[in-house]
Structure formats: C-alpha cells, structure tokens
Amino acid sequence: MIALSTLIILAALAAIPLVWWTPRGRGIDAVAWLGLAVLLLISPPSAGWMAAATVLAPLGMRLADRLRRREAFAALWTLVLLSAFVAAQLTPGMIWIGGAFFTLRQIHVIGDWWMGKLTPPSVAANLRYQLFLPALFVGPVHRIQNFERQCTRRRWDREQFFSGAERVLLGLFSAEVIGTAVLTQSRVGLRDLLKGANPFLQDWALAACDWIALFFTFAGMSAIALGLAAMMGIRLEENFNQPWRARNLLDFW
C-alpha cells in the first residue's frame, strides 16, 4: 500500500471520533474540512483546485439557471474539469490526489443538474460531498442525492459501526497482505520459474499476476473506504461488487 493512501486512511480513522463528537448535523462537514486539510498537506495544487471547483460549480449553476444558459454552462464546466485533469496528469512531478474520482463526481453533479434531476446544491452540501475523506482517494463515485439523504438520516448504529470496522480490516488484509506482500513475492517466484520460457508466455504470466495484484489492492482499498464511511454512519454505493459477473460497463462499475 503506498504511503499517500496510508496517510489518508489514518486521517479518516482519526475523523471517526470527530464525526461523532461534533455537534449534530456538522460531523460530515468537519470530515470534509479535515479532508481539505489533508489534501493541502499532501498536494496544495490538488487542494486549491478541488476547493475552488467545488465552490464555483454551485454558484455557476445558479447563475446559469437565472440566465437560462444551462446547456452552455454544463458543456463549458465539463470541458474545464477534463482539461484540468489532463493538464495535471501531464505536469511532471505534480502529486495529484483523487483527481479522477473528483472529476467524475463533479461531472455527475453537473450532468444530473443539466438533465433536471438535481437542483443546484448549496456550497456547503457540495463541499461535504466532494471532499468526504473516506471516498477522496479511491471512490466510490457515489451520487450526491443519496449522500445527502445519508447525511440527514445519519444516526449512531452499533451494528453498522462494527460491520464497517470489520470491512476495514478485511480491506487492509486484501490490499496489504494479498495485493502487496503475497502477490509481490509470487511474481518474483513466477519470474524465476519462467526463465528460459517463451518470451510471450513470460510477459503474459507476469501481466496476469500484476492484474490480479491490482484487483486485490483496489478491491481492498474500496472496502476500506466503504467501511470507514459506515463507521461514520454513511452507507455509500458499492462500486466493486463481483466485477467479473458484469455484463456491461455499467454493471462493472
């Protein structure tokens, strides 16, 4: 597990008592501000862009509604988001944290608003949705409507809390033990075993090992995010539930 993801997980664990000790209705807001602080510590450019885009999007949507320019703003803002994401990826040495998932969440909000499924969220609602710490690094790309309902209905639930903690532990085992330790050593052994074999077979076998490691790492990190959210009283949508059974891209994701 890379150091950056470990830092974010530790910060999210520290946020769990914060979310329950903060006065009612403000716990998730506190988690979002902590998420912004962690981003600022790791990657000031990421923090600056995400904070600015999160504040500007609802204001732009309201202005576009008043001017009756919804389609134009949706197209322009989507272009800005995608351009910023591509520019960040092409900038040498830049640490870009959670950029892909942030961009997808922003596009989801803009898309649902453009199609009339969503009224412009408040700046506060958009901040807590976009900067929710457990989902900041590896998703899932949950819907803002469901997230706001979860925030409103959030209550202490002992069973949900410990179920979330169990899922965090299972996710850590999947990502750290299986995805990193076991499969890294297996790859070394497989490479030694295939010395002298057909080059295509070597490349295929090692690539398969890498993909299996990626599966366990990403599945584990997703489980950690969902478990941490559950410990905060939030149930996020599943985004990695038996992907091998998917019949299309929507089922896969």
Where are these regions (language model features)?
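Membrane-embedded transmembrane alpha-helical bundles that form the catalytic cores
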Residues: 1-252
